[in-house]
Amino acid sequence: ALRHIANQDKKVAVIFHNYPPKNSNIGSGLGLDTVESIRRLLVNMQERGYKVDFIPKDGKEFIELLTRHATNDRSMLNDRQLAEANKITGKEYGDFYHTFEQPVQEQLKKDWDEAPGHVMEYDGRLLVPGTMDGNVFITVQPPRGFGEDPSKIYHSPFCAPTHQYIAFYQWIRDIWKADAVIHVGTHGSLEWLPGKNAGLSAACYPDLTLRELPDLYIYNITITGEGIQAKRRGAAVLDEHLPAPQSQAGTYEELEELEKLMDEYVHFQRTEPDNLPRLAEMVLAKAKEANLDNEVTYDESKPFDDYLTELHNYICDLKNLEVHTGLHILGEPPLEDGLTEYLWLLTRLDNGAIPSLNQTLAGQYGYDYYYLLENSSLIYEPLNLTFNMLIDKIGSQCREVIRILQDHDFAEEGIAQVLRQPWVQEAAKQAPAQIQIGASRTGQDAATQAEPLSFLERLEMVCGYICHTIYPNLMLTTDEQKTLIRGLEGEYIWPGPSGAPSSGGADLLPTGRNFYGVD
């Protein structure tokens, strides 16, 4: 039916998640800037002819707009908001309630009293919070319930949703007569309501609540199981989005100073052993200052070198962790420095037969990258660097490679320019054909085949994969917004696999697909 309704006549309900039900939690969604994403969707909808009366200039104005109207936050509701809010009358809900199967009516009565209950009830009517924007109703999903343990209720397979929860969807579907709903972000509660796991019936609350209303669901590509639940039990068409941007944690202040002291200690073991006791005291003091004395404990009965190795490895692991640097905005590909970091993130592990960039560049020194990580206090003799410092050098080289490709718009000339770099040419002369120290964790990757590729061949392979596959697919992130428009206009939404692109799954891209699970 959607493709036969003019855009200007379509009614669309946009439902933000709101758990716990406070104004400060409006728009919660794993890794997604939900508010800015929907603000941009409103722009796109208006351009396509949907009736959108106003578009907030930014996320702050959007939230201010939503909280001027009724929300789920009962502590913030005032008389004006209560009076102006949409409501469903006791009779309207009662007529619907009496169509439910008898066991459903009895459970609702047991859990939440006689219809219409007392949750979000106002003079015998049930509140429907939200803000009307032309033919777009922007609202928040009602709480599953209230009580001493709301988190338990959220996923409870036994506790019925409140009368107001059911009435909320009834109002959207049957009274306001929405043509479609969009659930925003990972994840809401509708697909977790009581009922059968598959093959739902009229006695199952997801079906009872949503019925036949088309359901578009913006979902994080990495959360496979819950997404499949939304499809199977909520009849949702998913619009998968990229995870939040990430970068290496790195070090700061005390950790940076401690790391420098440890590297000095390793070098002094060979050059100035008389200074080691004083340097050991400085390492212990700095570790305590950085609050690491409980994370890595020093046992005086054991050699200090054992403690130093453990501390070195701990900090090396810590600084190489991936941390979130912000939220993803639906339809916005990573750009500039963010693109550099994202491409590095997507190539830090092997992608099938494509060797990781980290592993490739570690190979020029004859080492497995993970061996370096696990033995960060050892010395790489040719450069007189600790493995920790060598890892930093490899990281800088990874970024340099990607930036050269960026500067050449990911064209073939960029790959050629990488291969012409003096340090690359020098590495090609010195690098062994195979990793000599530390077995690769990934088994038969491109660096350890029966007929091993040269260092230059491996590097060219990674660069080619970045330029010809990863980068073009990342730029198709714009499909995430287009998918919603396609869905609202009754067009087919292309399927795609789900998983973590950064865990050797760069081939899962592009996003903006109706994802399915893969083994």
How should each PLM-predicted stretch be described?
Residues 1-519:
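Ligand/cofactor-recognition surfaces for anionic moieties
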